[in-house]
């Protein structure tokens, strides 16, 4: 058999063999330690995989192979996030059904995954558009529909418990709810009760101003609007009022924030979630108007005495109620124009302020003065109450607005006790810092941190307001006016909404040839009579909800289904999820930080509260891959720019193992980097050298003293490499995994004629086993040619000897008073006393002591000595 390095001779052979033998099939829950390694649920596009996608999948495959060799029970599955706009739009363009496209596209993805040696367990393959899957998405919807969040116990409870409590006690013991007696509840008609319970359900329907994508002709969730544009179409989003279904994610805001401390995620992802949830503490203050009390939220109640006007969001219901006849025309025109702009545009820093007076006034009760009410688009309905008290002296946006429209500025905070108060007429910008209250009645002289608490308490005592917490987070809107999605399991009758019985799931998506989006805002399903019209068990004729769920509903629980994908009796087996979850390593793009990652955490917590899951967080460890850029390093790879490189063309020229190792070697995993063919050639050369060392016999020297020393050196290198590669795989440092293996290969090459057969065999055996996760095809072929028992991927990972892997020398940083003054290399086994003594005698330290006696010598073992004088 030729020993020439030619990947085409064996890569396809082993891919077929592994698949035939189901080598990577995952066993059930058992006594072994587990490792659940998961990639983000991909949508299988018609373009197939690019080398950029491989940057995600190769490292998780290496990790999976490594843990299998470590004796772990590894779950490394794959499936398809098949519902949604991309598949539907592509199918409309090609005049076919989306299901056919998904089958075609996913088959190509599977071919490419096999081509590059990804060890998925295909027995667990999922497709979110299959009824066997979305039946359970609908079941979870019903779990949320039949639940409410009880703040007294800080968890979700069955809605039936709330109904029982209302029948006994009304709302008397439920905090923050309008008074309702048991008698009033018991006298309500069924429809009235349903409407009342909608205020509590975790899945509910409500009229809402929504984000409308005019290109996709559907509603978008807040998280799907990026800088005012649809996240897929790029179209400027419009505002519409529609009846929509929502999940009450806001009930979990505090827990979503607090539990970030439980998980090992990149700090920037945690920060994005914190900012998106946007928790802020302050006060809710009431201002009296002719249409009733107008509530505002402020984080600075200490500036209440400086409020000189009020501003309403164009969407605020009080705009229509309060606008006087003399001003109504200009108000209506302004509101219409404002709704054409996205929230991002409206709140952009530096944008010129616009607004109109609505002809009405509110009373600032702290000084019993009427102040004018304006409508302006810089106030957003999605934050706070959609109304603000404008304090131009201490808020920059309010200051700019006041200066433009000639509104009064009243200074109520000065910089400090001895500071001179600002002159409102001379101010060029608002004073937004902390300070001391002035012209604020009984609170004059109170400093800001204390004042905020004192004023809030005073508002509560006097009935003017109360302490409040506000969130930027809004409930998750799931309704989509498109065909290709999970049907919402609700039927409408003359008496109101009726949830579909779990026994009648799934509500199947009809197989139709025409499903183009409508211009009316209705879902295409509304035009399919056989889907819409349904007879209920009691003989009532109803009509189905025709909106479908947004695709993020499907991806909010797929990690649970992978543990038990063929279960026809339940969404998942409780024993299996208890064993496998949470996911140990989750890998995908940072762009999903405030969509999929937030939604999945919410669903997990809700299902935990309802007794279905024994854990609170779905993904224990998260990593985001860096982007592969075009070779020029400036552009993303994209089909439109014609710069996409596919794994197919790379494997054809260089082989799958060269592609895999280059994907890892190219840079740190989380760093964006350009594609470089020269680097690919380098990994190819390295693999060829490793191949030759592993398969070509070399002459060994006659053992002598020189050989013994060479053996000791090689053994140390071998065990150090095993330790380093093991630690770096687990630490997701794949570039240093490859560089360590390259260095070890070169060391083997240089030492092969100077070491004994025993030492060389130990080293090459270790190299081959360490190559198995990163270059699985070559490793399997070499293993086979050595006539070893199939398969190398079922062998044990090499162990290292701690003594041999230990460093013989260390480099200590030498500091004097915390400043680095030098470095010193010394034996690793030096004691602390010896290290201190050597450091004090070194020229670098003595020079900076300048004759002074050290006060203290701080020793950090193996790292530094700091001399304090």
Label the model's feature ranges.
Residues 1-34, 313, 325-328, 388, ...:
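Basic, alpha-helical terminal appendages of large translation-related enzymes
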Residues 1-38, 68-77, 100-107, 265, ...:
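Conserved oxyanion/phosphate-binding beta-strand-loop segments in alpha/beta enzyme cores
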Residues 2-5, 96, 279-284, 414-417, ...:
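Long, charged, mostly alpha-helical binding arms that flank functional sites
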Residues 4, 13, 17-21, 94-294, ...:
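Residue patterns forming the tRNA-binding/recognition surfaces of aminoacyl-tRNA synthetases
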Residues 10, 15, 246-280, 313-356, ...:
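Amphipathic alpha-helical
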Residues 26-102, 126-137, 298-299, 364-401, ...:
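N-terminal catalytic cores of NTP/NDP-binding nucleotidyl/phosphoryl-transfer enzymes
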Residues 60, 73, 316-416, 424-431, ...:
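Catalytic alpha/beta core of large soluble enzyme barrels
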Residues 152, 199, 204-211, 467-496, ...:
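Helix-rich, typically C-terminal accessory recognition domains appended to large enzymatic cores
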């Amino acid at each position: 058999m030729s020993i020439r390095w030619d990947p085409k001779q064996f890569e396809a052979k082993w891919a077929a063999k592994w698949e035939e033998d189901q080598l990577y099939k995952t066993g059930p829950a058992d006594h072994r330690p587990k490792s659940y390694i998961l990639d983000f649920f991909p949508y299988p596009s018609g373009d197939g995989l690019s080398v950029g996608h491989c940057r995600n999948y190769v490292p998780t495959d290496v990790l999976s192979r490594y843990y299998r060799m470590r004796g772990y029970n590894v779950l490394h599955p794959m499936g398809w996030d098949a519902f949604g706009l991309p598949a539907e739009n592509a199918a409309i363009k090609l005049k076919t059904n989306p299901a056919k496209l998904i089958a075609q596209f996913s088959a190509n993805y599977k071919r490419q995954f096999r081509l590059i040696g990804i060890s998925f367990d295909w027995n667990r393959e999922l497709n979110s558009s299959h009824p066997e899957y979305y039946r359970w998405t609908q079941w979870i919807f019903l779990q949320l529909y039949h639940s409410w969040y009880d703040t007294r116990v800080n968890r979700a409870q069955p809605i039936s418990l709330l109904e029982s409590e209302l029948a006994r006690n009304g709302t008397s013991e439920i905090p923050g709810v309008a008074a309702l007696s048991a008698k009033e509840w018991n006298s309500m008609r069924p429809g009235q009760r349903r409407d009342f319970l909608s205020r509590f359900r975790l899945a509910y329907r409500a009229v809402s101003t929504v984000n409308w994508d005019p290109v996709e002709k559907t509603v978008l969730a807040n998280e799907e609007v990026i800088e005012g544009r649809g996240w897929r179409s790029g179209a400027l989003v419009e505002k519409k009022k529609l009846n929509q279904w929502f999940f009450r994610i806001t009930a979990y805001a505090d827990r979503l924030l607090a539990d970030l401390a439980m998980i090992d995620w990149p700090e920037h992802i945690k920060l994005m979630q914190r900012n998106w949830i946007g928790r802020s503490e302050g006060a809710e203050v009431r201002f009296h108007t002719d249409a009733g009390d107008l509530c505002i939220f402020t984080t600075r109640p200490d500036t209440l005495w400086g409020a000189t006007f009020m501003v309403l969001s164009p969407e605020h219901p009080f705009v229509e109620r309060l606008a006087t006849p003399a001003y109504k025309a200009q108000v209506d025109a302004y509101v219409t124009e404002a709704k054409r702009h996205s929230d991002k545009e409206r709140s952009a820093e530096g944008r010129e302020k616009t607004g109109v007076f609505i002809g009405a006034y509110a009373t600032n009760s702290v000084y019993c003065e009427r102040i004018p009410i304006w409508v302006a688009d810089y106030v957003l309905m999605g934050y706070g109450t959609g109304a603000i008290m404008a304090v131009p002296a201490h808020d920059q946006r309010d200051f700019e607005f006041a200066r433009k429209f000639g509104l009064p500025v009243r200074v109520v905070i000065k910089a400090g006790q001895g500071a001179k108060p600002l002159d409102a007429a001379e101010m060029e910008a608002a004073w937004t810092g902390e300070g001391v209250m002035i012209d604020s009645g009984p609170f004059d002289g109170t400093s800001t941190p204390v004042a905020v608490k004192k004023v809030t308490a005073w508002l509560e005592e006097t009935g003017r307001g109360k302490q409040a917490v506000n969130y930027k987070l809004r409930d998750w809107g799931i309704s989509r006016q498109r065909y290709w999605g999970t049907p919402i399991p609700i039927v409408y009758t003359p008496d109101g909404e009726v949830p579909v019985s779990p026994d009648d799931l799934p509500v199947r998506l009809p197989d139709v040839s025409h499903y183009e989006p409508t211009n009316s805002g209705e879902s295409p399903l509304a035009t399919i009579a056989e889907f819409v019209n349904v007879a209920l068990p009691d003989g009532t004729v109803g009509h189905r909800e025709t909106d479908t769920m947004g695709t993020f509903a499907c991806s909010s629980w797929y990690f649970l289904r992978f543990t038990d994908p063929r279960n026809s009796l339940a969404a998942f087996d409780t024993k299996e999820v208890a064993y496998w979850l949470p996911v140990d390593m989750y890998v995908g793009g940072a762009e999903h930080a405030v969509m999929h990652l937030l939604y999945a955490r919410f669903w997990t917590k809700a299902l935990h509260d309802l007794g279905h899951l024994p854990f609170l967080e779905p993904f224990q460890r998260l990593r985001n891959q860096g982007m592969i850029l075009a070779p020029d390093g400036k552009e993303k790879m994209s089909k439109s720019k014609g710069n996409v490189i596919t794994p197919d063309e790379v494997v054809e020229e260089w082989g799958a193992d060269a592609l895999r190792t280059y994907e890892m070697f190219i840079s740190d995993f989380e760093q964006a980097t350009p594609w470089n063919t020269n680097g690919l050639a380098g990994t190819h050369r390295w693999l060829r050298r490793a191949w030759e060392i592993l398969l070509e016999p070399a002459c060994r020297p006659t053992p002598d003293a020189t050989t013994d020393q060479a053996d000791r050196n090689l053994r140390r290198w071998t065990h150090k490499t095993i330790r380093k590669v093991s630690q770096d795989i687990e630490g997701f440092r794949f570039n240093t995994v490859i560089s360590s293996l390259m260095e070890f290969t070169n060391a083997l090459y240089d030492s092969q004629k100077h070491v004994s057969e025993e030492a060389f065999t130990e080293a090459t055996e270790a190299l081959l086993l360490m190559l198995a996760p990163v270059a699985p095809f070559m490793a399997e072929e070499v293993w086979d040619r050595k006539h070893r028992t199939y398969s190398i991927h079922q062998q044990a990972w090499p162990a290292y000897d701690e003594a041999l892997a230990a460093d013989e020398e260390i480099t200590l940083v030498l500091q004097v008073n915390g400043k680095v003054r030098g470095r010193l290399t010394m034996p690793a086994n030096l004691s602390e006393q010896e290290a201190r003594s050597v450091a004090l005698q070194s020229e670098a330290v003595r020079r900076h002591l300048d004759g002074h006696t050290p006060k203290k010598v701080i020793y950090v073992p193996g790292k530094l000595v700091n001399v304090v004088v």
